[in-house]
Regions:
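Membrane-interface helix-loop junctions and terminal tails of multi-pass membrane proteins
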Residues: 1-237
Length: 237
């Protein structure tokens, strides 16, 4: 979801983005992922407090805030780097848009930013900085939901990229995630960095650490399916 996503095509890693250009990428990924997690967790806490006892309304509030925040973050940071998602970064490595070192550094920045975003959200709402989530999210239906959610996300990004319409990625991804909150059983985590960060807040958006490994596996599977589908639809980038 960034300028390198000329990206998710089959080009060699750009050596010109070594140290000097890697630093802005890492900052953008850390800040973007962090603020995304803050939006997810923070809006979940706000929804619980503002609409107690109405889970449907809470989810609507959480979905709208997350989708809006994600759209803005992509639009603002896309000229630098706006993946905010290790699945997308892994695809950039597989398609040789990034080198192995660049991809690993980017994922590390996403994970660190996500953790910081969880702490920030907790503190803003006067919660302890870190509380281990206790919400179990497990079972075949939820796992299938995560495969579908991530496949749709990657299909959206890759199809727009391979068809030369990257200017639409910001709003398309934001709208997709807002919708996927509702049409997937898992409420569309669709992002390993965000999933891991959500372990750190025992609030509306939290996920029990025991539920995380299966979610991560489903996200990787979904990412692969979404990418292969997009390549089939758009064989010539």
């Amino acid at each position: 979801m960034n300028r390198d996503l000329a990206a998710l095509t089959d080009t060699e890693p750009q050596e010109t983005s070594a140290p000097a250009r890697l630093a802005p990428r890492l900052v953008a990924e850390a800040v973007g992922t962090g603020l995304l997690v803050t939006a997810v967790i923070g809006s979940g806490i706000a929804a619980q407090r503002l609409s107690p006892g109405d889970t449907g309304l809470q989810l609507l509030e959480n979905a709208l805030a997350t989708g809006a925040a994600l759209t803005v973050l992509i639009v603002v940071l896309q000229p630098v780097s706006a993946a905010f998602n290790p699945v997308v970064t892994l695809l950039e490595r597989l398609t040789r848009t990034l080198s192995t070192g660049q991809a690993l550094a980017t994922i590390a920045a996403q994970l660190a930013g996500g953790a910081a975003g969880a702490v920030l959200a907790n503190l803003m709402f006067s919660e302890p900085a870190i509380t281990v989530a206790t919400t179990d999210r497990t079972g075949p239906g939820l796992w299938l939901g995560e495969v579908v959610a991530t496949a749709g996300l990657v299909l959206t990004i890759t199809a727009l990229t391979r068809s030369g319409r990257t200017q639409h990625i910001g709003w398309a991804v934001g709208v997709y995630i807002t919708a996927a909150y509702w049409f997937t059983s898992s409420t569309s985590f669709a992002n390993p960095a965000v999933t891991i960060a959500r372990m750190l807040s025992d609030t509306f958006a939290g996920i029990n650490p025991a539920s995380v490994p299966a979610f991560l596996a489903c996200q990787i599977i979904g990412g692969a399916l979404g990418y292969l589908t997009a390549r089939t639809l758009y064989p010539q980038p």
